Amino acid sequence: MRCANLYFGVGVDVVARDCCPAPSCQAFPFNAEPETCDAELFGAGVDICHELDDRFGRPRSQVLSQRDVPGLTRAVIPLLAARGVTALSIGANTFSASADVPPIYRWRDPASNTSVIAMQNPGGYGDRLTLTTDGSAHALHLMFNGDNAGGHSPAQVAARHAELAKRFPNARVSGATWNSYIDAITADGSAARLPEVDKEEGDTWVYGVQQDLYKTAAFRAIMRARRRCIAELGYPICGGNASAAIANSTRFALKLSEHTWGFNWGYMDEVHYTNTDLAYALANVEGFATTQNGWREQRAYVAHAVGALAAAGAADVGASRLLELTKEELAAVTRPTEPTPTAPASGWTTVDPTKRITDLPRFANVAWNATAGGIGSLTTKEQGHDYARGRGGSFGQYQYQTLTENDFWVFMNETLKVQRDVAFGKKNLTNNANVTSGFWAGTLSGMWSKKAAGGDTDEGVDSFLQRVDMDAHLHGYYGAPSRVWTLFEFSRATATVNISVTLVNKTTTRLPEAHWVDFEVAVPVTPNDDVVSGTAGTPAPPPVCDSWSLSKLGSSLCASDVSLFGSTHIHAVSDSDAEHGSVSISGRGGADAAAVTFRLTTYDAALLSLECVHSVISLHCRPLSTPLCSHADSFALLSIPMPVPFRLFTRYKTAFPNPVHKDLDKGRAAEQAYICLCNNFWTTNYPNWYPFMEGDEDAIFRFQLQLS
């Protein structure tokens, strides 16, 4: 390699005076999972770094650097470009697969026609990565230390400098900042010749965000309050650093998107798995209570963000209004009240769940799953289309999942580059607990209805309430709630359904579990390969998506347009897109094959799992002693949802949707969207059991369906 200038980067803080420039920062405060943010808060994070650059007289950083997390969403590109950030660098966790992209490339967002230079090291943080571009005399050598290892010593930096000088005898080896390298390859034109990628990549670690379900719900509540305040009073009064109090609250709120949620201690114990053993360990085994306190400290950023606003005086109009809105939003997700439909004067009337509902103003037919709850048929009057798939009648149904150690071994064999049973699996679970792999539904024990207060007008909602009781063994030995209440509110004005799911008396468990709400829809779609681009600064019309459209940080992305080894099936979606919802799918339906669209907004849970229905083994209602689906059902259960981001192979008996090395299949006649309410799959970084704080035994999750 002919290299005239080798730039030598050692990270953001540690420098050696004889070979490196003054310290410089990157364009985001920490290693985050950006999908969990909305556009306003993510942008505020970039602004914080640029304000520090300005304060210390440094050039504003052009590069966002992310380590450990294997990837991030394409939706950050227009937000970065708008703030003068021209590049990003990803150093993926050593054990995790990351998107199959070149080491350095131009990553483009087609809708906004904006792009950044992307640098990716798939096998670690980048301790010995040397980046080169065709036709350039400049190269960049990275020297990042390992996870939690701190910075290099001056002696180590000097030794690497000497090593590089020997390796590249004809090059001038010099210390570098991110900016200096990006400036160099931009100036010589090589940046313009980089290979181009325009696919979504995503975050294959994002399945952990529902391991503290209250923290995620509260974080989303805080962001909703910020958006409402900005809509009312404007960004200069309510946004970013509008005042000292709001700026301080912004910093605390941002920390809720950090990729590490407490102490990584779970791998040190491979014995105390059962609920009885966990209770003993919390009281008697060193480390358990300390680890739990670490998760509580991370959740405390919710209170800190609120407290920063409360510290402002009445003269701070923006902070005062933002505090009011934040308290209002948080109240809706904190310690929900259990419904009492049988209470005197409650207004609820008992309903026979085997009877179809045909007298709703906007819906021609609604049928229920009379065994396990949920909707079996959902046909609108205007479109004449049944949006609920109907087979098994599990639309809007709560389902509980349990797993075995073998499930995790299959996942690790298919997903990780290196076996890492400790951090990603449940080592020795088989020897220390008696667990079964399967999906479990409860028993519908009651159903009630309440007519809209406006009578036969187009005002209000017609409500239906279901109570589902969970099996005593699932509640006692595992972590299922004792019962689940699901409220369906049918608008009389539009084809809109508001749904809330309330879990009551969830058991604390370390046994692997997940809680889901199933939205199995019937919207035929047509494959489409067209890409529509805009001009710089002018968004293009949204390209036609032949799969699920995902809302992330103000952008709408297509689930079938994900890079190889990117996060195809698992996504964190936003609730900020009024037009598209959190996730939507469009196609042809009804008697005349007219255009139909299904939009789902998830307000409190962020995690979405997508699966193709054509390969699902049918769900059969069974006694609660057996799961809805288990390994014995078929040679391959391809679409039982699990927070697994992609598939490599398809011929395993497993509860996981085995990762595949291709994009989400196009043109499916129907597809499933599962919302994950809670899980404890990942032993590293996230809480290993829930609840871990008194008062969290009950939880509420709200959704809205818009059908057109």
Where is each model-derived feature located?
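Catalytic-domain carbohydrate-binding cleft regions of carbohydrate-active enzymes
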Residues: 1-301, 455-622, 627-708
